[in-house]
Amino acid sequence: MRCPFCAHDNSQVKDSRPSEDNTSIRRRRQCEGCGARFTTFERVQLREVVVVKSGERREPFDRSKIEQSVALACRKRPVNQERLDQLVSGIQRQIETMGDAEVASKVIGEMVMEGLRQLDSVAYIRFASVYRDFTEARDFEEFASSVQEMSVHEVSGGE
């Protein structure tokens, strides 16, 4: 593993343990060149997935894009990092277990929307405002009203 401090090619693993959500291995490493210590995370990748964007453009699936989007939507919200990691890991597992080599970005966006809906309603609305391209305050109002109606419907037992 290349050292992030001096770019030396070799490092030694000093400690390995599963992450808190058991979806990755956390490794403490020490650079053989400069002696600096750093942490890496190793995740299982079930299959290579290609994301089909609008306009039929294709790019490799990148977990960090979902992490960044979810983190931005949840910024300054009472949602801890562990919950965010669980959400992103769950979405990644869903994508990889679909069995398809390609997945539409729209499908991923809907998975993120559903995950955020269950996690935090404000984060859900924030993400939706970008994902669904809200252009006016009325768009926010209408969406927020529908979210509130869903919440009331779920609390009342779906009646």
Curated annotation (Swiss-Prot):
Residues 11-24 have a biased composition (Basic and acidic residues). GO terms for biological process: negative regulation of DNA-templated transcription. A zinc finger (unnamed) spans 3-34. Residues 1-26 are annotated as: Disordered. Residues 49-139 form the ATP-cone domain. Its cofactor is Zn(2+). InterPro entries: ATP-cone_dom, NrdR-like_N, RNR_NrdR-like. Keywords: ATP-binding, DNA-binding, Metal-binding, Nucleotide-binding, Repressor, Transcription, Transcription regulation, Zinc, Zinc-finger. GO terms for molecular function: ATP binding; DNA binding; zinc ion binding. It comes from the Bacteria. Binds 1 zinc ion. Negatively regulates transcription of bacterial ribonucleotide reductase nrd genes and operons by binding to NrdR-boxes. Belongs to the NrdR family. NCBIfam families: transcriptional regulator NrdR. This is Transcriptional repressor NrdR.
